């Protein structure tokens, strides 16, 4: 009898958590700039690209983060693993210092995802990003999904799976 009650309470707590995080993601949802695919970006290696120039047959994970962000310390390793597995990842280092500072941080943490430095937060402002980390999943040039705050490798992997096969 106790196990049944424990399972019922656990399920109730889990569903409440899912509802609350979904509401928070909806409220924190960024606004996609109209010219999303035309925006030219430059990564820390000096490569210039646009979101449109990325493979449109694969979902793109756009990851807004900061070196100062506590939750990002837990999310960035998951993002790095996904990038190593071949997923398209473009990260935006938000207000994290100059390029040398960001490169140093990436190197110290052994992160190898494509990174654009946004030292003044101008790019993030165009998206109305108010929370880090914010992860925007782009599919065929459109925003497919958004998640904010702490998220896991498996949570992202499931989202990417759905974007690849149903997006």
From Swiss-Prot:
Protein name, as recorded: Thioredoxin-like protein HI_1115
Organism, as annotated: Haemophilus influenzae (strain ATCC 51907 / DSM 11121 / KW20 / Rd)
Family as reported in the entry's similarity comment: Belongs to the thioredoxin family.
Transmembrane segments: 10-27
GO molecular function, a single term: antioxidant activity
PANTHER family attached to this UniProt entry: THIOL:DISULFIDE INTERCHANGE PROTEIN DSBE (PTHR42852), THIOREDOXIN-LIKE PROTEIN HI_1115 (PTHR42852:SF17)
Keywords, comma-separated and alphabetical: Cell membrane, Disulfide bond, Membrane, Redox-active center, Transmembrane, Transmembrane helix
GO cellular component, one term: plasma membrane
InterPro entries, sorted: AhpC/TSA, Thioredoxin-like_sf, Thioredoxin_CS, Thioredoxin_domain, Thioredoxin_ResA/DsbE_sf
Keyword Calcium assigned: no
UniProt subcellular location: Cell membrane
SS bonds (residue pairs): 69-72
Major localization listed first in the record, in broad terms: membrane
């Amino acid at each position: 009898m106790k196990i049944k009650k424990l399972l019922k309470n656990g399920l109730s707590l889990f569903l409440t958590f899912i509802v609350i995080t979904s509401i928070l993601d909806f409220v924190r949802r960024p606004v996609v700039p109209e010219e999303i695919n035309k925006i030219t970006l430059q990564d820390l290696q000096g490569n210039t690209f646009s979101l449109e120039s990325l493979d449109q047959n694969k979902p793109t994970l756009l990851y807004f983060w900061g070196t100062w962000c506590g939750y990002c310390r837990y999310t960035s390793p998951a993002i790095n693993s996904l990038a190593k597995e071949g997923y398209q990842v473009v990260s935006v280092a938000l207000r994290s210092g100059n390029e040398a500072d960001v490169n140093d941080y990436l190197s110290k943490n052994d992160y190898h995802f494509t990174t654009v430095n946004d030292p003044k937060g101008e790019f993030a402002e165009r998206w109305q990003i108010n929370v880090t980390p914010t992860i925007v999943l782009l599919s065929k040039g459109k925003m497919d999904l958004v998640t904010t705050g702490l998220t896991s490798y498996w949570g992202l992997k499931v989202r990417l799976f759905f974007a690849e096969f149903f997006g």
